[in-house]
């Protein structure tokens, strides 16, 4: 490559030194120690507690969603669409599976899953709902799914490459929530 100097003469550009891709040997050596930490290695860094807090808030969201879907399943059973009431149960079970996966990841990161019923609704991103009419139930569940989608999308962006295992978990859950939202949107349109 060349460039013109002030006098207009062409001069070669100096080569820019770039850092080569290389593994962090110190971190690899550190991984040989602290075996009681299991999968936790130094790369988790200072944000591990923040990730645990985000996961605990998502755990609360999933548990509130389980409770809302279960209530809607049982109270919608006598309403216009038994098929939708049954689907509420399917969604409740999916949300329970999400909660289990989140709790498991919290433990893997060295945290404790917070199942405290006293703080669930305060920590949850989504609201509990006691609607009596099927259409209102569908709408409440769609709102909750959309809130969860936004929360998971933001968490995935925040975590980035800091914790690829947690990011993949959240991406899997996000895909399920997006599917739930599409189903609810279709039922509302009927």
Located regions from the model:
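Iron-associated oxidoreductase/ferritin-like identity signal
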Residues: 1-190
């Amino acid at each position: 490559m060349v460039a013109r100097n002030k006098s207009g003469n062409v001069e070669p550009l100096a080569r820019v030194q770039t850092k080569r891709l290389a593994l962090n040997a110190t971190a690899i050596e550190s991984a040989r120690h602290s075996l009681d930490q299991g999968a936790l290695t130094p790369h988790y860094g200072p944000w591990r507690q923040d990730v645990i807090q985000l996961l605990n808030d998502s755990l609360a969201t999933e548990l509130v969603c389980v409770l809302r879907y279960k209530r809607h399943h049982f109270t919608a059973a006598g309403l216009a669409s038994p098929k939708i009431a049954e689907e509420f149960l399917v969604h409740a079970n999916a949300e329970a599976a999400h909660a289990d996966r989140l709790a498991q990841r919290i433990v893997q990161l060295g945290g404790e899953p917070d199942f405290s019923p006293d703080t669930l609704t305060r920590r949850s991103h989504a609201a509990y709902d006691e609607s009596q009419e099927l259409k209102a139930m569908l709408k409440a569940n769609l709102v909750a799914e959309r809130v969860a989608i936004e929360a998971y999308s933001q968490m995935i962006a925040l975590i980035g490459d800091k914790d690829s295992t947690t990011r993949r978990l959240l991406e899997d859950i996000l895909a399920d929530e997006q599917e739930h939202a599409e189903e609810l949107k279709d039922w509302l349109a009927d």
